[in-house]
Amino acid sequence: MITKYFTKIFVRFNPFGPEAKTARLFLCAIPPRQRAISTKLTNELLTANSQKTPLIKVVFKDKTEMELDPAGLSFGELSSHLDRYSRKLQLKENIESQ
């Protein structure tokens, strides 16, 4: 997963719900150095009787926001969805640098 272009990440999930695996794998895929330096990471744990829905929200360097439901996607689907936009930013960056 291309995480270079993430500036903010918000993850909300129930650790015992069906969305937990996708959310935990997503959080593990972010490099520790990036978490410490360039990306603001916020997470919120839900209880079993919480009314809030699980959510993964990513803000990219160009201020584009993507909100995804971890309960409805596998980690592979989630990462390919985010990579699609990251590749667009990477291409744009490569064109501008030439």
From Swiss-Prot:
InterPro entries xrefs: Ribosomal_mL53, Ribosomal_mL53_fung
Keyword Plastid: no
GO CC annotations, alphabetized: mitochondrial large ribosomal subunit
UniProt-recorded Gene Ontology molecular function terms: structural constituent of ribosome
Gene name of this polypeptide: MRPL44
Cellular compartment(s): Mitochondrion
Pfam families documented for this protein: MRP_L53
Listed name of the protein: Large ribosomal subunit protein mL53
Function: Component of the large subunit of mitochondrial ribosome.
Domain of life: Eukaryota
